[in-house]
Amino acid sequence: MGAGDYIVTATNPVTGEMRSNSIKVISLIESDDLTKYYKNASQFVVRIHSADGGYVGAGEDVTFNINGVFYTRTTNATGHAKLNINLRQGNYTITTYYKNCSQGNEIRVLPILSADDLVMKYRDGSQFKAQLVDGQGKAYAGQSVQFNINGVLYNKVTDNDGVAKLNINLMAGQYIITSSYNGFNTANKITIRG
């Protein structure tokens, strides 16, 4: 039986008397969904129950499947197994397997660098701005963000609000700008009207 609530009904074949009871089957896998920022130290953590309701000790193999890739980790002394999450921004489903049990959870990886498309007039003084946050979602000052526009690279340092700014002095047209920090990239469009 999988984890869940069940009703079991017993019938006396002689008298036809019926009696029902509720049964709750608890998963051996204890886990929660995870929301984290790109490349921060947060891990996906599960705790494994033993058949008697306690927790297993060290040395039990637990398998994780995320994006079709399987990883096996071993429980520690308190029954925890941990998996580092080094995925790009997005939503993922992770499935944990232990013995005959499986359990699914959601992992959400948040961006550390974000920006909006820019529409401007030729040489109107507009700047392209990218917001950088640290692994806890707080403004990340004093960091170098790289901008790539038309194959030309610019490095700008974030201010106290975590914002890196690039002056735009291009001819009228549409351009793709890529902002990068620590392996994270985000692309935006700049539209310049004459």
Feature names for model-found ranges:
Residues 1-194:
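Solvent-exposed beta-strand/loop surfaces, strongest in extracytoplasmic domains of secreted
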